[in-house]
């Protein structure tokens, strides 16, 4: 991982702004020159909000965590705000329909899970330690009438209706509930509260948060007479505009219980060539020289997937540690024919989750065992006994990634090596999994 560097000089600010610019992370700013002047005046506080809609963040949330991380590395003070209050309502920005409202218990579980993951990205100790706050702490005792008097009176309905996040939902079939319509007021007040209590002058977020961020800036001017600033970064999307972080099996999470280090690593290994350089710029801290080198290698020899390997290694180490990287790389080697070693049942089932499989009773491996020719046909790796014999004689059959050439080979309990699965392979990449049932 890159060494942590503390910088507070004007050169550091210029470097930060320039770094954000070349990475393509400055999607919109309310006043770029004003932000640069503010950052040059000394360490500043910046915040980004995260609504706890699940017990884990998914990869899209890394864009914002990395934004806070970049500001912290430049000597500024990041606040990660968990929406214990706003999460009860749900942000309509970028959503086609209203979310189901979460119970208080589920919301707290989500808050706890998301908060723990932020520690992989931010340093919560030291001179410019990150702060983890929850907006439920200042909203829980704020009465509805007081909120309307203090905050609601500062929001012209016409201006709210003009926000893209509101207008698009009003024009949709799903419509927009009053609950969601009120979300903008709550997020705007978060900015005002943090400006009062932590002298926070900058809010950042994804491009879909522009309306909410500017609402907070307007409220700060009305309530505090203070100039606040906003920055948005692009959303993490593919070159054709689809949001990244989804696979056929669902979202790619940061929680290893929901998306294993191996699956997380593989997601980045499989990023398309036209997307990988953008991901490296958005999500890592690699320097410009290395970026340019990886870009050249991707153009000249895309088959090596050098940029994808670097992206997968960098992000997996950040989220899952060095052990997670080693585990993921070992699993990848197995997929390409490496020794199984001490790989467990569950790891093998995960590595080969997408290959054909069949159930075999354990009794078939007892006594004389299961004839390899029959096993290859059962697993549909060979069409007939003759096909299986040819594959064996040509040296193209593997059991647990060990070559088998003996046509009379019998698979027995000893071949399981304490596991409950057998990995069969024909050729380089044609796999099947035998799941042994008691």
From Swiss-Prot:
Motif ('KMSKS' region): 243-247
Binding site for ATP: 246
EC number: 6.1.1.1
Keywords in alphabetical order: Aminoacyl-tRNA synthetase, ATP-binding, Cytoplasm, Ligase, Nucleotide-binding, Protein biosynthesis, RNA-binding
Organism whose genome encodes this protein: Rhodopirellula baltica (strain DSM 10527 / NCIMB 13988 / SH1)
Protein's gene: tyrS
Residues binding L-tyrosine, per UniProt: 47, 183, 187
Reaction it catalyzes: tRNA(Tyr) + L-tyrosine + ATP = L-tyrosyl-tRNA(Tyr) + AMP + diphosphate + H(+)
Protein localization: Cytoplasm
Keyword Cytoplasm: yes
PROSITE patterns: S4
Family listed: Belongs to the class-I aminoacyl-tRNA synthetase family. TyrS type 1 subfamily.
GO process terms (BP): tRNA aminoacylation; tyrosyl-tRNA aminoacylation
GO cellular component, one term: cytosol
SUPFAM superfamilies to which the protein is assigned, alphabetical: Alpha-L RNA-binding motif (SSF55174), Nucleotidylyl transferase (SSF52374)
Motif mapping: 'HIGH' region: 52-61
Function: Catalyzes the attachment of tyrosine to tRNA(Tyr) in a two-step reaction: tyrosine is first activated by ATP to form Tyr-AMP and then transferred to the acceptor end of tRNA(Tyr).
Ranges for domain S4 RNA-binding: 370-436
A Pfam family: SYY_C-terminal
Name under which the protein is recorded: Tyrosine--tRNA ligase
Binding partners and assembly: Homodimer.
Record-level Gene Ontology MF annotations: ATP binding; RNA binding; tyrosine-tRNA ligase activity
Segments traversing the membrane: none
């Amino acid at each position: 991982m890159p060494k942590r560097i503390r910088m507070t000089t004007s050169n550091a600010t210029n470097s930060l702004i320039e770094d954000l610019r070349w990475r393509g992370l400055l999607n919109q700013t309310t006043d770029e020159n004003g932000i640069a002047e503010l950052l040059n005046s000394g360490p500043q506080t910046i915040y980004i909000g995260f609504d706890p809609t699940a017990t884990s963040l998914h990869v899209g949330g890394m864009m914002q965590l990395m934004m806070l991380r970049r500001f912290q590395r430049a000597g500024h003070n990041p606040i990660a705000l968990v929406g214990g209050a706003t999460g009860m309502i749900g942000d309509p920005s970028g959503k086609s329909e209203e979310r189901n409202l979460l119970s208080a218990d589920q919301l707290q579980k989500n808050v706890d899970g998301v908060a723990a993951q932020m520690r992989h990205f931010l340093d919560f100790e030291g001179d410019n330690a990150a702060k983890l706050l929850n907006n439920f702490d200042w909203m829980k005792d704020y009465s509805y009438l007081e909120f309307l008097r203090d905050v609601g009176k500062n929001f012209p309905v016409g201006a709210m209706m003009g926000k893209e996040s509101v207008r698009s939902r009003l024009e949709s079939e799903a419509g927009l509930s009053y609950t969601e319509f009120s979300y903008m007021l709550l997020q705007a007040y978060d900015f005002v509260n943090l400006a009062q209590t932590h002298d926070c002058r900058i809010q950042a977020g994804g491009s879909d948060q522009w309306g909410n961020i500017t609402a907070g800036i307007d409220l700060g001017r009305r309530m505090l007479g203070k100039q606040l600033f906003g920055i948005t970064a692009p959303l993490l999307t593919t070159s054709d505009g689809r949001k990244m972080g989804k696979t056929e099996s669902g979202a790619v999470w940061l929680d290893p219980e929901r998306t294993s280090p191996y699956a997380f690593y593989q997601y980045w290994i499989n990023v398309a060539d036209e997307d990988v350089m953008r991901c490296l710029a958005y999500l890592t801290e690699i320097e410009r020289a290395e970026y340019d080198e990886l870009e050249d290698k991707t153009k000249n020899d895309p088959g090596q997937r050098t940029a994808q390997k670097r992206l997968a290694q960098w992000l997996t180490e950040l989220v899952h540690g060095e052990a997670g990287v080693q585990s993921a790389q070992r699993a990848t080697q197995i997929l390409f024919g490496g020794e199984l070693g001490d790989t467990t049942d569950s790891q093998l089932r995960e590595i080969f989750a997408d290959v054909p499989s069949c159930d075999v009773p354990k009794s078939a491996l007892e006594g004389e065992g299961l004839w390899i020719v029959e096993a290859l046909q059962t697993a549909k790796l060979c069409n007939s006994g003759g096909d299986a014999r040819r594959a064996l004689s040509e040296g193209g059959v593997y059991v647990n990634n060990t070559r088998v050439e003996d046509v009379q080979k019998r698979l027995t309990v000893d071949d399981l090596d304490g596991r409950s699965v057998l990995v069969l392979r024909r050729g380089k990449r044609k796999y099947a999994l035998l799941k042994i049932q008691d």
